[in-house]
Swiss-Prot record:
Its EC number is 2.1.1.199. Keywords: Cytoplasm, Methyltransferase, rRNA processing, S-adenosyl-L-methionine, Transferase. S-adenosyl-L-methionine binds at G35, G36, H37, D55, F80, D102, Q109. HAMAP family: 16SrRNA_methyltr_H. Gene3D superfamilies: Putative methyltransferase TM0872, insert domain (1.10.150.170), Vaccinia Virus protein VP39 (3.40.50.150). This is Ribosomal RNA small subunit methyltransferase H.
């Protein structure tokens, strides 16, 4: 049994501030984790408020037992990409006042060697957010073609040595299958042609495999579209990203829906037509953690918070 690992929620106050909490509102925490953001949301809700939390990690579902006696709270075991489906089942489409997403892997997942996310701790090569189902990283590495591995490393890890590393993995697995995180990390450290200062050579490959195994970017796309569908007028989106691939998706989504559809040039357009084509309004600028927060929690360094509001048109 894995021990319980602590988790410091990044940009905690700022993210919940972004939701502009109403005491009687209905909110979604799409990435419950260990409940840091949920706890803060609940502290700002009144007796008639409601919080629906979602997580696909069985350990997160167990952690949600801390709120078992709070009638305002409920937890759903599943991926945040399906949030629109869960809301539809509850009959709450168009009634959600805010959606919070804290993307990427959590500290407890990284710190628990048995989960297989970290190249700094030796453990089984798993990397599944929901370790009760799906293909493990070890299983994928055992069957993937060189071209497929190279594509994943390049696309999801922006790894410059993607093809070379893929070839080396394919050659080594003929002798010994990759089953441990240290085994893979040591190989990458040995064969990487170029190394980045203050970054372990395996960082990008581990990120890439994790994103691929968990379909993380597809989940983000689905969650954003789903959030837009379920938000009430003036409902808020408050989203924390941890690397450029995540943030790019969020930034482009907000930009696309705040600029609206492209309308014919040279033809008269009514204000109603302009408004109808816009569904979101950015709230403030992208926010990064303070130096104080980074000093207290080094993993906050790369985080970016973006907030947007559902327009009432």
């Amino acid at each position: 049994m894995s021990q319980d690992f602590a988790h410091l929620s990044v940009l905690l106050a700022e993210t919940v501030d972004g939701l502009n909490i109403r005491a009687d509102g209905i909110y979604i925490d799409g990435t419950f984790g260990r409940g840091g953001h949920s706890r803060e949301v609940l502290s700002r809700l009144g007796v008639d408020g409601r919080l629906i939390a979602i997580d696909r990690d069985p350990q997160a579902i167990k952690a949600a037992e801390q709120f078992a006696n709070d009638s305002r709270f409920q937890i759903v075991h599943g991926g945040f990409g399906q949030l629109a489906n869960y809301v539809e089942e509850l009959g709450l489409v168009g009634k959600i006042d805010g959606v919070l997403l804290d993307l990427g892997v959590s500290s407890p997942q990284l710190d628990d060697a048995e989960r297989g996310f970290s190249f700094l701790r030796d453990g089984p090569l798993d990397m599944r957010m929901d370790n009760s189902q799906g293909e493990t990283a070890a299983q994928w590495l055992a069957r993937a073609e060189i071209e497929d591995m190279a594509w994943v490393f390049k696309t999801y890890g922006e790894e410059r040595n993607a093809r070379h590393i893929a070839r080396c993995i394919a050659a080594d697995r003929e002798k010994t299958p990759f089953t441990r995180t240290k085994q893979l990390a040591d190989l990458i450290a040995r064969v990487a042609k170029s190394k980045e200062r203050n970054k372990h050579p395996a960082t990008r490959v581990f990120q890439a495999i994790r994103i691929y195994i968990n379909s993380e970017l597809e989940q983000i796309d689905q969650a954003l579209e789903g959030a837009l569908k379920v938000l009430a007028p003036h409902g808020r989106l408050s989203i924390i990203s941890f690397h450029s691939l995540e943030d790019r998706i969020v930034k482009r989504f907000i930009r696309r829906h705040s600029q609206g559809e492209e309308l014919p040039h040279g033809l008269p357009v009514t204000e109603a037509q302009l408004n109808k084509s816009r569904t979101l309004m950015p709230v403030g600028k992208a926010m990064k953690p303070s130096d104080v927060e980074i000093e207290q929690n080094a993993r906050a360094r790369s985080s970016v918070l973006r907030v947007a509001e559902r327009l009432p048109f």
